Amino acid sequence: RIVTATTDARMIAVDKNTGQPCSDFGEEGQISLLAGMGEVKPYYYFVTSPPTLASGVLVVGGWVMDNQETNEPSGVVRAYDPRTGELAWAWDMGREGDTSLPPQGETYTRGTPNVWSLTAADDELGLVYVPTGNATPDYFGGHRTEIMDKYASSIVAIDAKTGLTRWHFQTTHHDIWDYDVPSQPTLVDITLDGALRKVVIVPTKRGEIFMLDRVTGEPLTEVSERPVPQTDLPNERSSATQPFSTGMPSFAHPRIREQDLIGITPFDQMACRTAFHQLRYEGPMTPPSVQGTLLYPGPAGGMNWGSVAVDEQRQLLVINNLHLPWQIKMIPREEDIARNEAQDARRGYGIGGPQRGTPFAARVELFGSPFFLPCLKPPYG
């Protein structure tokens, strides 16, 4: 049979020869993925990646609309019987150890990091590897609980039989940059120090690539915690350090200098240089600010959906990397309300959003000229 998930939060099974719904799967060949989710506003939850068949169950995550509010649908990961469509387990980080459907009147934990990208499975080890995003919304985290931060922007190995966590590795601490782990984890066997190791390679939006033992989650190349710039937003916090994959090549790009900026006319080049000096920018991981922050790599990467390719025979890793800086401006709630009341939609939020339930909205857009061209010299990827 062929099983697929949809953008209206269903999973459908059809006969691979006839295309007819499999009548023994759910109700006439389909199940709803909204069970246990509670209130789901239109377009706030759907599936963007196919289910993964892992040790006899179908594992599926879901996409949650970015940057709307704190109380968005859960980022729960679920597994289903591929023949009947019955729930096998649910990995809900707010109910660790409880893999069942929530009781009547309750829901999976709302606002938790979701898994919108592709997952990967090792049937021999009985593990499914899920790349996580961060708790909603993306650019402010003062409200986040310890458990929301624990599994955010991480690679998590889940026991495919039980739905329990075996290990996890975090690529960004207290992520306030939308640095989700965006790519399918790549599972390969690599010879290291004369021994064949089972490896999972984790590409990131940050341009850092982490190589981990896929049995234990232990880094197989050096990872260093380095100091990073700190937030100046009230009621926010930021991690004093962030993990850098110093034992692997980094594609996080050099720090941008003024001479790296371009324009097709003197006018837009001057506009780019003026904006560059007005934005807060202290290199990688500069936190969002009311002043406006230059973020490079931006929330599109670095690396994104495409993951990496591996030539196992020659032990070569091939990547596709993006070179585009973005700018993030945090808008105090009172100012955002005034803008909305005045119906000032001249710029909107870009790919940011109102972030209701926090003190700030966020406007996030490409660091570009008034002619909508990148301010940074090419190449762009």
Please describe what each predicted stretch is.
Residues 1-10, 15-381:
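A fold-level detector for beta-propeller and closely related beta-sheet-rich head/sensor domains
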